[in-house]
Curated annotation (Swiss-Prot):
Annotated ranges, domain SOCS box: 442-505
UniProt cross-references to CDD domains, sorted A to Z: SOCS_ASB3
Positions annotated as ANK repeat: 9-38, 42-71, 78-107, 111-140, 145-174, 178-207, 211-240, 246-275, 279-308, 315-346
Native organism: Mus musculus (Mouse)
A single Gene Ontology CC term: cytoplasm
Compartments (UniProt record): Cytoplasm
Name of this protein: Ankyrin repeat and SOCS box protein 3
PANTHER family: ANK_REP_REGION DOMAIN-CONTAINING PROTEIN-RELATED, PALMITOYLTRANSFERASE HIP14
Subunit structure: Interacts with ELOB and TNFRSF1B.
InterPro entries xref list: Ankyrin_rpt (IPR002110), Ankyrin_rpt-contain_sf (IPR036770), ASB3_SOCS (IPR037329), SOCS_box (IPR001496), SOCS_box-like_dom_sf (IPR036036)
Keywords: ANK repeat, Cytoplasm, Repeat, Ubl conjugation pathway
Gene: Asb3
C-alpha cells in the first residue's frame, strides 16, 4: 500500500474536517460522538491531519476529546506522530500545543528520525528552540544512518542552527554509521560557513571516516577550493592517507576529478613520496584514470614523473599503459605523457595493436620504442597474433623500423596462426636460408600444406637482398625509425627505395609507410 498518497475515500469525516481546518463541522461531528482515532490508508488519524495542516483549533478540540498519551503519541504507518508532522512543516503553535499535551520531543519514526532533526531540516529556528526547551536531545542518532541534527545543519549550511546546537552541547565530533562527522559533511557539500563555525569550535580537521577519508580529501574530490584552502590553513594534513592501502591522498582526488584550482593548492603542500615511491600511487595515474589532461599537465609541469611507478593497485606498469584502458579518445593523454618524456616499450606497442591504434603504433616506432630492452615479448606477440588480419597496417612499419623478424618466427603461435602471405612477408626481412633449426622445423611443417610457402623457402635469396640485409643491419637503430635517413644516403633513388623494401610492399599491395597514415597520426605524434 502507498503510505505517501492520501486516498480521500479512506479518510474519516472527522479526519477530513481536521484536514480542511473546518472547526464548525468538526464540532458537530464530535458532538455526535464520531471517533477521533479512525486511520486512513497511510495510518493518519485526525490528530495527524490537524497537526500537518496547521489546524490549531481543530487540534485543540481533538486533544480535548481524547487527551490520552496513546492518542497524542499515535503513529502513522511510517512511524510519524503528530509532533513529527507539525515540526516538519514548521508549525510553531501546533508544536507547542503537542509538547504541552505530552508529546515526546525525542520520539523517532520508522526511519529513526527525531522531531529535532525535522526542525533543522525545515529551517525553523523557533521550532528548534521550542523542542530544546522541552528536552529534545541534541546528541545521539537523529535519523537513519546515524546522522545527528548537527550533521543536517552542517549539510544545509544553516549557521544560526549550527551555533545554537553547539551552544546546547551538541558533540562536534559526532559520527554517523560511516564515521562521518559534521565537518566532513560541510566539506563534502562545500558549506564554507558551516566549516568555519565547526573549526572555530574545535572540530578535528584531520578526522577520518571509516574508509579513512578526511574532510580535506572529500573537499578536494568535490572541487570545493575555498573549503580546501580553509582546511589547509587550519592545519589539515594533505599527507594523511585516505584509504586502507595507504596511498590515496587529497591530491589524487583533485587530479582524478579534474579540479585544477584545488590541485594547484595541493601540489606544493603534498609530500613527493607519492610520485615514484614504491607501494604508492602517483597522482599522475589519477589524472590519467580520470582522463584529466589539464591536471596531468599541471602535475608533470611541477616535476611529477610521467613514468611514475609500477602500479599494482590498478595493475599497470606505467601511466601510459593505463591510458590505453580509457574508453574515450586517449590520444591527448598519450601526447602529454610523451611530451614530458614518458618511456615507450613493447607493452605500449602491444596495446596499440589491441585497440587497433595503428597510426599511434607507427608514431611510437618513430619515437624509439624498439630501442629499449624488451621484457614483455610474449604479451606483444599475443596481441600481434590477434592483429594479424590487419597486418598491412602495422607489420611493415614494425619490420622496417628494424624489428627482428625472428622474434615472430620463433613463436609457434605466430607461425601457426599466420596466413601464408604474412609468413612470406615476414621472411622477406630475413635470410630464410639461414634460420634457426627450430624455426626451420616449424616452417617446414607449415610448408607441407602450402605450395606458396614451400616455394618461397626453396628459393635462394638474391645477392642484392643479402646486401640489403647487411646494410640495414649496419645502420643504427635510430636511423630506421623513418625513411628520412635512408633517403639521405649518397645512393641512387632506386637503391634507397630497395633498402626500404619498396618492391616487396608493392608486391603485397601495401601502401608505402609514409602514405599509410590516417587522421590518428596527428593526434599521436
Amino acid at each position: 500500500m502507498d503510505f505517501t498518497e492520501a486516498y480521500s475515500d479512506t479518510c474519516s469525516t472527522v479526519g477530513l474536517a481536521a484536514r480542511e481546518g473546518n472547526v464548525k463541522i468538526l464540532r458537530k461531528l464530535l458532538k455526535k460522538g464520531r471517533s477521533v482515532d479512525v486511520a486512513d490508508n497511510r495510518g493518519w488519524m485526525p490528530i495527524h491531519e490537524a497537526a500537518y495542516h496547521n489546524a490549531v483549533e481543530c487540534l485543540q478540540m481533538l486533544i480535548h476529546t481524547d487527551s490520552s498519551e496513546n492518542y497524542i503519541k499515535a503513529k502513522t504507518f511510517e512511524g510519524f506522530c503528530a509532533l513529527h508532522l507539525a515540526v516538519s512543516q514548521g508549525h510553531w503553535k501546533i508544536t507547542q500545543i503537542l509538547l504541552e499535551a505530552g508529546a515526546d520531543p525525542n520520539e523517532t519514526t520508522l526511519e529513526e528520525t527525531t522531531p529535532l532533526f525535522l526542525a533543522v531540516e525545515s529551517g525553523r529556528i523557533d521550532v528548534l528552540k521550542l523542542l530544546l526547551q522541552h528536552g529534545a536531545n541534541v546528541n545521539g542518532s537523529h535519523s537513519m544512518s546515524g546522522w545527528n541534527s548537527l550533521h543536517q545543519a552542517s549539510f544545509q549550511g544553516n549557521a544560526e542552527t549550527i551555533r545554537l546546537l553547539l551552544k546546547q552541547g551538541a558533540d562536534r565530533e559526532c559520527q554517523d554509521d560511516f564515521g562521518i562527522t559534521p565537518l566532513f559533511v560541510a566539506a563534502q557539500y562545500g558549506k564554507l560557513e558551516s566549516m568555519s563555525i565547526l573549526i572555530s569550535s574545535g572540530a578535528n580537521v584531520n578526522c577520518q571516516a571509516l574508509d579513512k577519508a578526511t574532510p580535506l580529501f572529500i573537499a578536494a574530490q568535490e572541487g570545493h577550493t575555498k573549503c580546501v584552502e580553509l582546511l589547509l590553513s587550519s592545519g589539515a594534513d594533505p599527507d594523511l592517507y585516505c584509504n586502507e592501502d595507504n596511498w590515496q591522498l587529497p591530491i589524487h582526488a583533485a587530479a582524478q576529478m579534474g579540479h585544477t584550482e584545488t590541485l594547484d593548492l595541493l601540489i606544493p603542500r603534498t609530500n613527493r613520496a607519492c610520485d615514484t615511491g614504491p607501494d604508492k600511487v602517483s597522482p599522475v595515474y589519477s589524472a590519467v584514470f580520470g582522463g584529466r589532461e589539464e591536471c596531468l599537465e599541471m602535475l608533470l609541469q611541477n616535476g611529477y614523473s610521467p613514468d611514475a611507478q609500477m602500479c599494482l593497485v590498478f595493475g599497470f606498469s606505467s601511466p601510459l599503459c593505463m591510458a590505453f584502458q580509457k574508453d574515450c579518445d586517449f590520444s591527448g593523454i598519450v601526447n602529454i605523457l610523451l611530451k614530458y618524456g614518458a618511456q615507450l616499450n613493447e607493452l605500449h606497442l602491444a596495446y596499440c595493436l589491441k585497440y587497433e591504434k595503428f597510426s599511434m603504433f607507427c608514431s611510437f616506432l618513430k619515437k624509439g620504442s624498439l630501442m629499449v630492452p624488451w621484457n614483455h615479448t610474449s604479451e606483444f606477440i599475443s596481441y600481434a597474433v590477434k592483429a594479424q588480419t590487419k597486418y598491412k597496417a602495422w607489420l611493415p612499419h614494425l619490420l622496417l623500423a628494424g624489428f627482428d623478424p625472428l622474434i615472430l618466427l620463433c613463436s609457434s603461435s605466430w607461425v601457426d596462426s599466420a596466413s601464408d602471405d604474412i609468413l612470406i612477408f615476414t621472411l622477406e626481412f630475413s635470410n630464410w636460408k639461414r634460420l634457426p633449426s627450430a624455426v626451420e622445423k616449424m616452417l617446414s611443417v607449415r610448408a607441407n600444406s602450402s605450395w606458396a610457402l614451400q616455394q618461397h623457402l626453396a628459393s635462394v635469396p638474391s645477392l642484392t637482398h643479402l646486401c640489403r640485409l647487411e646494410i640495414r643491419a649496419s645502420l643504427k637503430a635510430e636511423h630506421l625509425h623513418s625513411d628520412i635517413f635512408i633517403h639521405q644516403l649518397p645512393l641512387p633513388r632506386s637503391l634507397q627505395n630497395y633498402l626500404l623494401y619498396e618492391e616487396v610492399l608493392r608486391m603485397n599491395e601495401i601502401l608505402e609507410p609514409a602514405a599509410n597514415q590516417d587522421g590518428e597520426t596527428s593526434k599521436a605524434t
